[in-house]
Amino acid sequence: TGEKSISCSECGKCFIKSSELTVHQMTHIGEKTYSCSECGKCFASLSHLRVHQKIHTGEKPFSCSECGKCFLNRGSLVRHHRTHTGEKPFFCSECGKRFAASSDLRVHRRTHTGEKPFSCSECEKRFLNPWSLVRHYRTHTGEKPFSCSECGKCFARSSDLTVHRRRSHTKEKPFSCSECGKCFTSSSELTVHLRTH
């Protein structure tokens, strides 16, 4: 029947198998018994450890039949495949906006609730999602982890590196104006241009 009959006493989440509930409950009590021999990071289940270990080996066994891009796990491949199909099965009940990944919907919902659960330990500024916090934190550390293979220039954000490569090296302009056909290296440049029409 597909009925989820076993629930977690801590948060109420339901499961079909008791083994799934056991693994889930470890996330509450902090019990993580499987550790990575490479970096020491710990996991609640062996399957999660095995997925993590592929980061060290570079193994990406799941490949996209459309474009050949490879992924660490099946879930990432499924999410990626939606970029080809345009499928967006997750929608916001507040505004109707649709998303390809449930995690994107979860972050989007915070724009309605105003929740910003991730805070900077340096300045207390708060963010909707963890990657925005990581990006922001680089303004304090000065870290620029993205370097150009052509000239060696470094950037704090991967998107800045992409725009730099287009401007300085490839001369690629993938964003075109539907009104006049003029092309731009970044979506932000196109947005500014569109205001002139």
From Swiss-Prot:
A zinc finger (C2H2-type) spans 6-28, 34-56, 62-84, 90-112, 118-140, 146-169, 175-197. GO terms for biological process: regulation of transcription by RNA polymerase II. One of its GO terms (molecular function) is DNA-binding transcription factor activity, RNA polymerase II-specific. It is found in: Nucleus. Keywords: DNA-binding, Metal-binding, Nucleus, Repeat, Transcription, Transcription regulation, Zinc, Zinc-finger. GO terms for cellular component: nucleus. InterPro entries: Znf_C2H2_sf, Znf_C2H2_type. It holds the Pfam family zf-C2H2. PROSITE patterns: ZINC_FINGER_C2H2_1, ZINC_FINGER_C2H2_2. May be involved in transcriptional regulation. Belongs to the krueppel C2H2-type zinc-finger protein family. This is Gastrula zinc finger protein XlCGF17.1. It comes from Xenopus laevis (African clawed frog).
